Amino acid sequence: MSAPLIVLVGPMGVGKSTVGQLLAERLGTGYRDTDEDIVTAQGRAIAEIFVDEGEAAFRTLEKEAVRTALAEHEGVLALGGGAILDADTRALLAGQRVVYLSMDVEEAVKRTGLNAARPLLAVNPRKQWRELMEARRHLYEDVATAVVATDGRTPEEVTQAALDAVELKEA
């Protein structure tokens, strides 16, 4: 069985996709995003899945997407912000090189505007984001082998910090 070089976790808008693509380039490997896997397989946006089928149905799809990607992908893998909510998914991450990209709420506002395209943040986005982070922070920390703060850093700086944190050398 193969395993990803690095798995990225963290809240929505933290930069997992951007940093993941930069990491893949610097390591000379592929990049994969489980949210994109779900969108491709379902033929619709994640927000539509939430509206049409509910969060529980989405989390089931997400769990399977993560399981498949962990088994198939050998490069850099980015997980959706809520993937770590599932205990089985957290168990699958044991033994993986997992980097938790963190940010505070002010950084989240700057990066995402905490906009309505985020289905879990549709009402009072700042309050919702804080509550999500209070519920998830310890789960991100539990699965992480390294934590990289992204606040005030460029994607390139975060990428270098992630490489340094997991002691990987560029290709």
UniProtKB/Swiss-Prot annotation:
GO CC annotations? cytosol
* Coiled coil stretches, renumbered: none
According to the UniProt entry, what is the EC number of this protein?
2.7.1.71
The kind of enzyme this is, by top-level EC class, is transferase
Q: Has UniProt tagged this entry with the keyword Repressor?
A: no
Location(s) in or outside the cell:
Cytoplasm
Alphabetical GO biological process terms: amino acid biosynthetic process; aromatic amino acid family biosynthetic process; chorismate biosynthetic process
Q: Where does substrate bind?
A: D35, R59, G81, R136
Cofactor(s) for this UniProt protein: Mg(2+)
Classify the source by domain of life: Bacteria
> What keyword terms does UniProt attach to this protein?
Amino-acid biosynthesis, Aromatic amino acid biosynthesis, ATP-binding, Cytoplasm, Kinase, Magnesium, Metal-binding, Nucleotide-binding, Transferase
Q: Which PANTHER family match?
A: SHIKIMATE KINASE, SHIKIMATE KINASE 1, CHLOROPLASTIC
This chain belongs to the protein called Shikimate kinase
Originating organism: Streptomyces coelicolor (strain ATCC BAA-471 / A3(2) / M145)
